[in-house]
From Swiss-Prot:
Protein name: Transcription factor HES-1-B
Keywords: Developmental protein, DNA-binding, Notch signaling pathway, Nucleus, Repressor, Transcription, Transcription regulation
GO CC terms in record: nucleus
Motif placement: WRPW motif: 264-267
Residue span(s) of domain Orange: 110-143
Upper taxonomic lineage: Eukaryota, Metazoa, Chordata, Craniata, Vertebrata
Gene behind this protein: hes1-b
Any single biological process term in GO: negative regulation of neuron differentiation
Domain bHLH: 34-91
Stretches with biased composition (Low complexity): 10-22
GO molecular function: bHLH transcription factor binding; protein heterodimerization activity; RNA polymerase II cis-regulatory region sequence-specific DNA binding
């Protein structure tokens, strides 16, 4: 009997062990386990965001380039990104050209800023340890080439047409595109109207001479060296009731009067 009792007592804790284990609550997940379980969900959301942004970018770039979206419905992601990069570079060139036409000092400021950044990178690479010598040499060489290209850039200033010219009510404002060239002062006086006093010629733009009149009108005279100095000139007036412009070697009293129908006009 005592032996049987001892066997029952010794076996009772073992039999009770599974019941105690089943009643214990589940252990909380660690941070690494939580990241592993949520990684597929985060990856799915990330891909959805990328695809949504690429879809919007495709619509915007096709509208900006004025291309038919039906013909480019199956564009690859790499094509969309390349088209976007090219479009942004073109916009940057246009904005830089517009800024230089209004403020010629923009190019100098850009050069100074780029040179300052290059000097800062050079100082950092010269004092930083652990940078490969080959990488440092290639980086500094690339920046030096960029500086040379920037200093070689030359955007000529666009000439400003005086705003005092009043157009004729029957015609629109004449638009004359001049070649980009540095203005040069012309000391020779030119009479712009029949019988009027000679007016000092203000500037010369790339072979075209801007001659302001006393009443606010203006004319462009061809002064290219290929033409003789005593040859005829082509006046462009904003008014039809004017005479021809005369070179300084011709007197107004010698020239016959010219009617409005014989004057060449761009319109």
């Amino acid at each position: 009997m005592p032996a049987d009792v001892m066997e029952k007592n010794s076996s009772s804790p073992v039999a009770a062990t599974p019941a105690s284990v089943s009643n214990t609550p589940d252990k909380p997940k660690t941070a690494s386990e939580h990241r592993k379980s949520s990684k597929p969900i985060m990856e799915k959301r990330r891909r959805a965001r990328i695809n949504e942004s690429l879809g919007q970018l495709k619509t915007l770039i096709l509208d900006a380039l004025k291309k038919d979206s039906s013909r480019h419905s199956k564009l690859e992601k790499a094509d969309i990104l390349e088209m976007t990069v090219k479009h942004l570079r073109n916009l940057q060139r246009v904005q830089m050209t517009a800024a230089l036409s209004t403020d010629p000092s923009v190019l100098g400021k850009y050069r100074a800023g780029f040179s300052e950044c290059m000097n800062e990178v050079t100082r950092f690479l010269s004092t930083c340890e652990g940078v490969n010598t080959d990488v440092r040499t290639r980086l500094l060489g690339h920046l030096a080439n960029c500086v040379n290209q920037i200093h070689a850039m030359n955007y000529p200033a666009q000439p400003q047409i005086p705003s005092a010219a009043a157009p004729h009510p029957a015609y629109g404002q004449p638009m004359v595109q001049l070649p980009a060239a540095a203005p040069q002062s012309s000391p020779a006086p030119i009479a712009c109207k029949m019988g009027g006093p000679p007016v000092e010629a203000a500037k010369v733009y790339g072979g075209f001479q801007l001659v302001p009149a006393s009443d606010g009108q203006f004319a462009f005279l061809i002064t290219n060296p290929a033409f003789p100095q005593n040859g005829s000139v082509i006046p462009l007036y904003t008014n039809s009731n004017v005479g021809t412009a005369l070179p300084p070697s011709v007197s107004p009293s010698v020239m016959p009067s010219v009617t409005a129908d014989s004057v060449w006009r761009p319109w």
